[in-house]
Regions:
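Polysaccharide-binding surfaces and accessory modules of carbohydrate-active proteins
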Residues: 2-37, 41-256, 274, 688-708
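Active-site-proximal substrate-binding groove within the catalytic cores of carbohydrate-active enzymes
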Residues: 26-27, 54, 509-734
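Active-site and adjacent substrate-binding regions of carbohydrate-active enzymes
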Residues: 138, 369, 373, 403-407, ...
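Short, structured beta-strand/loop micro-motifs enriched in basic residues and often containing a Trp
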Residues: 262-272
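Flexible loop/turn segments at secondary-structure boundaries
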Residues: 295, 299-300, 340-343, 371-376, ...
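Aromatic-lined carbohydrate-binding/catalytic grooves of carbohydrate-active enzymes
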Residues: 325-465, 478
Length: 739
């Protein structure tokens, strides 16, 4: 196949107007591109929901090219370390533009070429109807050999002129993410986090500074989140922009300043950070990892609403391709791991838990880690066969345990790590080296485990056979796919560069997931990675549930749950609720409250609970099922603003997006400090106790009094009777219109 040419396109050819403008829009988004004979195509205008259309405004000063391509033989046009100002990007020239439909998406493709190097680029923008968001991706090819070390997935000109403000007024929101401390959000003026004003009136060159985040290896959310938010302008022209990178591997995003403008650049792996490169020639082209952005009037909460709608559209489109529906979003799941068995299941332990979970009326009982262990706890470096333990479940065996789960009215769930093989596993000897990540001529091992390379036919065949065997033998309804091994920078097998091998595996793995889902659309699969260490939308548009953390302390879990909707759909947030009999009432409510407005992921020794405590857990499940009825039509909000990881008061909730009088919900946690707080609610809305319902807790068992005091049409004061940790979920009853 000759890759050194443009991909044929049957779409409608778009015409550039007399002013050199190419305008693309729907009812919400408007993008204005400027085409010149002596310059690359630039994004000179951008607007979204609630903003004045960009096509009615002057072009943004200092607009940036729509794609950047960094090569080792031409570099940048100036000396800095950003992903922008690439020489190849600056030499691209407009060839053609096309619009067409792909499923529900409206697509614009802009083709450019550098006649000197032979580089071709096809930059694609796509949007769903009714959503103020756009997906971006580029294909690059070359007529001659060209070594490429970075390509942008998106390169946005921030519409500062349209917002009526400058760089000095820009605020940035970003998040740290590490094991047991996910969703640690921060906010700061851009000028204070790496982009100082260097006075370009005196210094005659583009500033070289940037604010950037990146990830390494395969934990795409293991250090930082692959998204950010930017707010700009004031008053009626105030607007916000959010972006995300949809890749289950390394990524980078940055904010940088030009002479007259600001850019956001985002993409997958690159040479400087990830040892990635690709050499283009007539047989080799390259497609970037996808990225998306949303833009609208208002602040960060309004633009998160739009990204929530976009994530739903991405997920719905993928479900349709794989022949699935949204039924999985109604399931209540019990898992035996968290603060309970911790990966040490036996028949004697499981049967009482199964009976207890059955009495609660949950839909799925998941046996977490250990069901395959015949080594009395020494399974970590022996996994890979995924065959049931011969000594943990007595005469019943795993089949008998599965039968007990079904007799109790629940579906079976099983834990699995598809991508790893223990160094002591028989599978390690059966598969060739080419089935694993290798460096320096040896298999890569991490903590006693090898990492499968899903580009390998042997690796895929092993896991295909494994999944089909388990499904045929045990008829599970649910899988928890975990991921606890990080293989480093990549693999040298069938790759010119280590990062190239890693990218190839990452893409092959999601294709394997698509194939599995297509063969078994009835399967519900959780995405877990030591909690939420790989919670990106390459994975989450395909899988159904995301464990938001492995955090065992409900006091810390509260802030993780409170911030989860910034990056994960509410209907995919598996927030653990691990109530125990020995907890006082308020501690039990505190942990259960985390899952009510997301996805209540139950654990705990339910077999040890008395009837009074079981009523409380049933009350949580009943409240959660009420939320699930309308959850997919609601968007997140934060009545106390951005959750602070060390904050005393935390709050998050759901509001109906459409103009209707559906009920919204607010979860609020008090972890200490002042005994009262004022929350903001929609105009005319009232708060009603939702969980726990009256009678489920009382003062004799440690209950705290909560008092609700309306102050005006949009503010309510909440007061607690003492400083002990406590939480409540309130229903938000709307007036006739919510927006």
């Amino acid at each position: 196949m000759n890759c050194s040419q443009f991909t044929p396109c049957e779409g409608r050819t778009e015409i550039v107007d007399a002013d050199g403008r190419l305008i693309w829009h729907n009812d919400d988004i408007c993008m204005v591109f400027v085409v010149r004979d002596n310059a690359p195509v630039v994004l000179a205008g951008l607007s979204g929901y609630g903003m004045r259309p960009a096509c009615e405004l002057n072009n943004e000063k200092g607009a940036f090219p729509i794609v950047e391509v960094l090569t080792s033989i031409s570099g940048r046009t100036m000396n800095h370390q950003r992903l922008t100002d690439t020489r190849e990007g600056s030499q691209l020239r407009f060839v053609a533009a096309y619009t067409y439909e792909r499923g529900m998406r409206h697509v614009l493709r802009i083709d450019q070429k550098d006649e000197h190097s032979g580089l071709l680029t096809e930059t694609e923008f796509s949007m769903f109807p009714g959503v103020s968001a756009v997906s971006c991706q580029s294909r690059i090819a070359s007529e001659r050999r060209l070594p490429v070390e970075a390509v942008s997935s998106l390169n946005l000109t921030v519409p500062l002129d349209a917002a009526g403000g400058g760089v000095d007024g820009v605020e940035v929101y970003w998040a740290d993410s590490t094991w047991a401390a996910e969703n640690n959000w921060h906010q700061a003026p851009l000028r204070e986090i790496g982009l100082p004003d260097i006075n370009t009136n005196i210094n005659p060159r583009v500033p070289g500074a940037r604010f950037n985040l990146s990830s390494r290896s395969t934990w795409s959310t293991g250090e930082k989140l692959p998204l950010g938010v930017l707010t700009m302008g004031e008053g009626i022209r105030r607007s916000a922009l959010i972006w995300q990178i949809e890749h289950n591997g390394p990524w980078t995003w940055e904010i940088g300043e030009g002479i007259d403008g600001l850019h956001i650049t985002a993409g997958g792996p690159n040479g400087d950070d990830h040892q990635w490169a690709v050499v283009l020639d007539e047989r080799t082209d390259f497609v970037t990892v996808p990225a998306s952005f949303a833009i609208c009037s208002g602040g960060w909460q309004q633009v998160v609403e739009q990204m929530t709608l976009h994530r739903r559209a991405l997920r719905s489109a993928r479900l349709a391709v794989n022949g699935q529906n949204h039924d999985s979003e109604q399931l209540v799941i019990y898992n035996d791991y968290m603060n309970t068995l911790f990966g040490n299941p036996t028949a004697d332990k499981e049967l009482p838990l199964i009976e207890g979970a059955g009495k609660l009326g949950v839909d799925v009982f998941c046996i977490d880690a250990g069901w395959y262990d015949s080594a009395d706890g020494g399974w970590w470096d022996m996994v890979g066969e995924w065959k049931p333990s011969t000594n943990r479940f007595g005469n019943l065996g795993l089949k008998g345990i599965a039968s007990a789960i079904r007799k109790a009215g629940m579906g079976l769930g099983l834990w699995l790590e598809p991508e790893v093989v223990g160094v002591r596993s028989p599978i390690a000897n059966e598969l060739p080296d080419s089935a694993f990540f290798c460096r320096h001529g040896e298999r890569v091992a991490d903590d006693g485990r090898y990492h499968l390379d899903f580009r390998s036919p042997d690796a895929r065949a092993h896991m295909d056979d494994t999944m089909e065997r388990i499904i045929a033998e045990f008829q599970p309804k649910f899988f928890k796919f975990d991921y606890n091994t990080v293989p480093g920078v990549g693999t040298e097998i069938d790759a010119g560069y280590l990062g190239e091998g890693l990218l190839g595996h990452s893409r092959a793995y999601v294709r394997w997931l698509d194939d599995l889902k297509h063969r078994h659309p009835e399967l519900v699969i959780e995405n877990c990675g030591s909690g939420a260490m790989r919670a990106d939308y390459a994975m989450l548009q395909r899988l159904d549930l995301q464990s938001t953390s492995d955090q065992c302390d409900p006091a810390i879990y509260a802030v993780i749950a409170a911030g989860a909707s910034m990056s994960i759909l509410p209907e995919q947030q598996g927030n653990w609720g691990y109530a125990q009999q020995e907890m006082d009432d308020e501690t039990a409510v505190f942990t259960l409250a985390a899952g009510i407005a997301g996805r209540l992921y139950l654990s705990g020794f339910v077999n040890r609970m008395d009837e009074r405590r079981l009523r409380l857990v049933r009350g949580a499940i009943e409240a959660h099922r009420q939320v699930l009825r309308n959850q997919s039509g609601q968007v997140p909000f934060w009545p106390l603003g951005l959750p602070v990881f060390s904050g005393d008061w935390l709050a998050s909730g759901l509001l109906p997006y459409a103009d209707n009088n559906e009920t919204g919900y607010m979860t609020i946690w008090h972890r200490g400090g002042a005994n009262s707080v004022v929350v903001e609610v929609p105009q005319g809305a009232t708060l009603r106790p939702f969980f726990p319902k009256p009678g489920l807790i009382d003062k004799s068992h440690g209950a705290v009094d909560w008092h609700v005091e309306p102050l005006d049409g949009t503010h309510v004061r909440l007061t607690v009777s003492d400083n002990r940790r406590s939480a409540r979920v309130y229903a938000i009853d709307m007036p006739d219109s919510t927006k």
